[in-house]
Amino acid sequence: MGLHCHTDLARAQALAQELRALGGQVGLYPGDVAERAQVDQVMEGFLQDFGHLDVLVCNAGLARQELFTDISLDSWRQMLGVNLDGVFHCCQAALPHMISRKAGKIITLSSMWGQVGASCEVAYSAAKAGVIGLTRALAKEVGPSGITVNCVAPGVIDTAMNGALSPETRAALAEETPLERLGTPEDVAQAIWFLASPAGDFFTGQVLAPNGGFII
């Protein structure tokens, strides 16, 4: 298993150690997915250590709330650079190796805001909508090579990314969700695991949405 990180190396190292303690073979590869050269280095390092790639999970993400009229060009480019360009870079780096083996799975991470849009998150919503479009189109292109491409689009998940939300906002979001709770990282992980497992072999070009019914 290869872990990639950019902003929090200490936490990534701790996770790698935890997985190794459970018996896993884990490599850690720092790099910025928005920079193609760094993605190529990550892929090269992984393939040197493990030989081949079975599953690629594109889950690097960045979120920021801004009024549309306040978004600077730099902010816009950063948001799309991480959330959309990063997926493009990772898929392009991985696909030659998957195509040569005629096997592989790619799982991208979008958001329910990529499906319906979010006020004050136009850049984020646009990037995540782009991820869904990329996933569906790429699934058609590489399906004949035996490669599946699917997307997970979570709802409101109880993570550090949403840590700035007030208790009142969190309660309101939970109330707005038919299952009356926020999602957990485990909810998202189970969706990814399903698509990566043999149970997901006949799924491609699909958007799996663990959102508790927030959007239906």
Positions of the model-derived regions?
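Conserved glycine-rich Rossmann-like NAD(P)H-binding loop of the short-chain dehydrogenase/reductase
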Residues: 1-13
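C-terminal substrate-recognition "lid" of short-chain dehydrogenase/reductases
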Residues: 88, 99, 103, 181-210, ...
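Alpha-helical segment proximal to the catalytic Tyr-Lys
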Residues: 96, 140-144, 201
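The beta1-alpha1 cofactor-binding region of Rossmann-like NAD(H)/NADP(H)-dependent oxidoreductases
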Residues: 9, 30-42, 73, 186-187
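Substrate-binding pocket helix/loop in short-chain dehydrogenase/reductase
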Residues: 67-68, 75-80, 162, 173
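Residue(s) in the substrate-gating loop at a strand-loop-helix junction
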Residues: 111
